[in-house]
């Protein structure tokens, strides 16, 4: 039986102060797998942003005073809504983004639910400190919510990244104005429709539209006390500068060119799957994708040949079909970027082992590309240094542990990476030597709540998915008490 794909409203307004506005100027949201329009959404104006910020400021006056018990209860109710609507949200995310439904059903949506439950749990355990400095002086340290936060989320994981941003901010007592990518706004809008009744008006506000318009206006709005962004390093740098100019903090989770390192003694079959998961998950549109595959010389030919055969067997298909393993890129622009880099690799003398072409035929109306493996003669090749953001991995041979560490660290990025070996001492040595914020050992792309995620170098500032995020959405207050009854005698 054909799956019903009519799961969106025709038009979406903005969520401001608990009310859905009447749609104004509209933009189209497309299904990247077939080019069809899914729905229309609002292209917000400066006045819309002003109204959303004002609503968040007003709501903060009371939301900040709610107890951790009250906020935890709401977060758990939000998680319940996600669980109850898993199939709907999974299909909506798949249609809007192009990723296969087996991923949204098993990863994106359940992980989002878990993030709300995680922060509902850890907020109950947060405590201040009190220190008796001496016989007369007591220092009390408290953390208070930072205020109104402006959050901008990317198109590669719109639902999950919204959870990464919203859950800790609400838990900390902040109010929110959040802006999804104009390429993938629909799943967040649908989610907000389902949870709006759970939140006091103005606590969560959603602005949609062009990043160059409403997104840019948000960056310089003086009503924000913090900015948070997930996306490219180029835009992240721009946002960091905007935050610095306003003297407010920013959390930035940015790009990567992660090293997936395979030693001769790797667990072979598991490693084959790990190489695929590192670069084919979400069509390679993952900031921490294992796009540089380093293989030790003793196993190189066997592993690369086997990996190429696995790439050829991947079922690329319509993302809403249950047996599809890899879906569509998010839009035509991203597909063009991928194909451009394949050509750059060829011009640099790299060998295309498999893939590298747009898929035509029955999938010709969509933005589909073959899983691609490129043998790079050098780690200095552009395809080994620049973020492609697609299912394209470069393969590089290495001899020694020292050599691969040097090559892995020879990158402007430092977001993710992995080590594959049955020697735990080697795994720990290499993990400690890698200049990256997340190192997986004998696994890849595991992203649970409770494990801090973020980058070194130009891969960002701050962390996500851990209770330390509560510190990022709060500020420290010190209450200093003198119990001495007499004058100090200083004057």
Residue positions per predicted region:
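Hydrophobic face of amphipathic alpha-helices that form TPR/SEL1-like repeat modules
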Residues: 1-32
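N-terminal alpha-helical segment of soluble enzymes
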Residues: 32-97, 298, 310
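Conserved C-terminal structural/oligomerization subdomain of aldehyde/semialdehyde dehydrogenase
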Residues: 34-40, 261, 315, 347, ...
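Residue-level signal for inorganic ion chemistry
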Residues: 35, 71, 93, 116, ...
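Short, well-ordered beta-strand elements within core beta-sheets of diverse protein domains
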Residues: 37-44, 58-65, 151, 260-263, ...
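Long amphipathic alpha-helix in the N-terminal Rossmann-like dinucleotide-binding domain
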Residues: 54, 73-87, 101-126
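Rossmann-like NAD(P) dinucleotide-binding subdomain of oxidoreductase/dehydrogenase enzymes
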Residues: 128-270, 398
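ALDH superfamily catalytic-core signature
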Residues: 234-378, 441, 488-490
């Amino acid at each position: 039986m054909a799956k019903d794909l009519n799961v969106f409203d025709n038009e979406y307004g903005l969520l401001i102060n608990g009310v859905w506005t009447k749609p104004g100027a509209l933009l189209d949201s497309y299904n990247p797998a077939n080019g069809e329009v899914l729905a229309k959404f609002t292209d917000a104006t400066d006045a819309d942003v002003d109204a959303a910020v004002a609503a968040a400021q007003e709501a903060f006056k009371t939301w900040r005073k709610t107890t951790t018990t009250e906020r935890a209860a709401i977060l758990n109710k939000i998680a319940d809504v996600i669980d109850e609507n898993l199939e709907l949200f999974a299909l909506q995310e798949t249609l809007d983004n192009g990723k296969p439904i087996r991923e949204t059903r098993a990863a994106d949506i359940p992980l989002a639910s878990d993030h709300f439950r995680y922060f509902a749990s850890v907020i109950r355990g947060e405590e201040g400190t009190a220190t008796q400095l001496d016989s007369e002086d007591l220092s009390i340290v408290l953390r208070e919510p930072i205020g109104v936060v402006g959050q901008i989320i990317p198109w590669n994981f719109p639902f999950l990244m919204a959870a990464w941003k919203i859950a800790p901010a609400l838990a900390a007592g902040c109010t929110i104005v959040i802006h999804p990518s104009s390429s993938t706004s629909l799943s967040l809008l649908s989610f907000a429709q389902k949870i709006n009744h759970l939140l006091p008006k103005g606590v969560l506000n959603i602005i949609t539209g062009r990043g160059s318009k409403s997104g840019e206006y948000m960056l310089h709005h003086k009503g924000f006390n913090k900015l948070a962004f997930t996306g490219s390093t180029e835009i992240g740098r721009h946002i960091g500068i905007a935050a610095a100019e306003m003297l407010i903090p920013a959390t930035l989770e940015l790009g990567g060119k992660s090293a997936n390192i395979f030693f001769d003694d790797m667990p072979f079959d598991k490693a084959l799957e790990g190489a695929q998961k590192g670069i084919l998950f979400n069509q390679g549109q993952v900031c921490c994708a294992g796009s540089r595959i380093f293989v030790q010389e003793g196993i190189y030919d066997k592993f690369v040949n086997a990996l190429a055969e696995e790439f050829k067997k991947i079922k690329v298909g319509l993302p809403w079909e249950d047996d599809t393993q890899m879906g569509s890129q998010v839009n035509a622009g991203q597909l063009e970027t991928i194909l451009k880099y394949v050509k750059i690799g060829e011009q640099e003398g790299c060998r295309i082992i498999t893939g590298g072409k747009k898929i035509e035929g029955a999938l010709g109306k969509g933005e589909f590309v073959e899983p691609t493996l490129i043998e790079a003669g050098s780690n200095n090749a552009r395809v080994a240094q620049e973020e492609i953001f697609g299912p394209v991995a470069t393969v590089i041979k290495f001899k020694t542990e020292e050599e691969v560490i040097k090559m892995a660290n020879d990158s402007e990025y430092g977001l993710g990476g992995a080590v594959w070996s049955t020697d735990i001492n080697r795994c720990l040595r290499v993990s400690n030597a890698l200049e990256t914020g997340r190192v997986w050992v004998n696994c890849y792309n595991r992203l649970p709540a409770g494990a801090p995620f973020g980058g070194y170098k130009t891969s960002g500032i701050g962390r996500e998915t851990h209770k330390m995020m509560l510190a990022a959405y709060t500020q420290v207050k010190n209450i200093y008490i003198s119990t001495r009854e007499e004058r100090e005698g200083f004057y």
